[in-house]
């Protein structure tokens, strides 16, 4: 009965476009365990939302999976410099192969007796297993939006590592801005926030279906949104100006333009930007950061462009991975230790983290 009431309340909030704005509740509800101390294996599934509708939405889902019978090979496939080469999608250096997953970012138990997240270490990750059984439990959900002429698979170096850290990552392929779109137009970005909300409403309905293989493992009261470039614009467009939102957090990578009216989020926001980005200048991201009404952080990568720091092994990747993961752990798992790690996640030369109104 409690679950039915929760879903009803969420659907009311989603249909209305706003709802309770409790960004970092504490303690975590019983349906969600504490932030994981060890990385999960990663599975992947795909489905299409509204396949016969006006705007069909193919969706890729990466999720925490049960361990494989034998340890998987640990490898990040070679980067294909020809993939995702459009100026607002992942550029050549950012076009990571489709299957890399998160490296081990958790240390052995420390002197305190608790395992704590460590620096990412080698930029390698476990192989993604399509159709693998879900790990037990319910997990917070991150909706990830790709950039222009891009695809979810080109962002898997980051999104699969988030899945290994205990998040269900759902990534729609937007109908008119993806790499394979027949009727491509960048102007369609303004319609993508509505597409993203349509997907979230669908996920909430799945969470209400008894025994649904996906819905049974999603904490549908714990959503965040993230995206790169035009996907970052889409993410920002999901936050109505100055209004509470069912989204508990947002991550805007190399983005910040307003595509759906003025956006001044109340929820915690993290911005990631290269200082030498010529496609979406850092000033665009900083202006969006300045408009935030709630807790916000800005990770700047000195001398970097539009997304090379999203490729494993490139300068800044380890810091971006650590910062984004801890930001999600704080906002979706109420992990206070992750909040307190944020100032030290990006202390390498060439990275600077600025924060405003973060809890202490």
Task: Enumerate the predicted regions with their spans.
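Short beta-strand/loop motif that positions the catalytic acidic residue
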Residues: 265, 271-273, 277
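Alpha/beta-hydrolase-fold serine-hydrolase catalytic core, especially in secreted/extracellular enzymes
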Residues: 26-27, 303, 313-360
């Amino acid at each position: 009965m409690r679950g039915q009431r929760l879903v009803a309340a969420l659907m009311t909030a989603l249909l209305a476009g706003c709802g309770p704005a409790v960004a970092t509740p504490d303690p975590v509800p019983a349906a969600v365990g504490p932030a994981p101390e060890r990385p999960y294996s990663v599975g992947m599934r795909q489905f299409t939302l509204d396949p016969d509708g006006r705007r069909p939405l193919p969706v890729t889902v990466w999720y925490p999976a049960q361990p494989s019978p034998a340890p998987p090979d640990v490898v990040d496939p070679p980067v294909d410099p020809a993939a995702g080469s459009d100026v607002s999608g992942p550029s050549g250096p950012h076009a990571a192969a489709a299957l890399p997953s998160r490296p081990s970012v958790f240390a052995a138990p420390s002197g305190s007796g608790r395992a704590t997240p460590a620096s990412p270490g080698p930029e390698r990750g476990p192989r993604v297993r399509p159709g693998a059984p879900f790990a037990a439990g319910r997990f917070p959900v991150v909706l990830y939006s790709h950039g222009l002429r891009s695809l979810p698979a080109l962002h898997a170096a980051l999104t699969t590592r988030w899945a290994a850290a205990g998040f269900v990552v759902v990534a729609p392929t937007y109908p008119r801005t993806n790499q394979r779109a027949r009727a491509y137009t960048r102007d369609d970005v303004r319609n993508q926030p509505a597409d993203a909300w349509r997907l979230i409403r669908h996920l909430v309905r799945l969470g209400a279906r008894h025994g649904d293989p996906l819905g049974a493992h999603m904490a549908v009261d714990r959503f965040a949104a993230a995206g790169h470039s035009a996907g970052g614009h889409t993410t920002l467009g999901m936050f109505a100006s100055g209004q509470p939102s069912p989204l508990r957090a947002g991550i805007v990578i190399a983005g910040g333009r307003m595509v759906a009216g003025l956006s001044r989020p109340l929820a915690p926001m993290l911005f990631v930007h290269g200082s030498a980005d010529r496609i979406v200048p850092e000033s665009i991201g900083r202006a969006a950061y300045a408009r935030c009404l709630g807790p916000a952080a800005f990770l700047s990568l000195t001398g970097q462009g539009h997304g090379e720091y999203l490729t494993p092994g490139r300068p800044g990747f380890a810091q971006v991975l650590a910062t984004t993961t801890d930001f999600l752990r704080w906002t979706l798992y109420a992990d206070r230790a992750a909040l307190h790690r944020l100032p030290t996640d990006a202390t390498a030369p060439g990275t600077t983290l600025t924060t405003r109104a973060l809890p202490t």
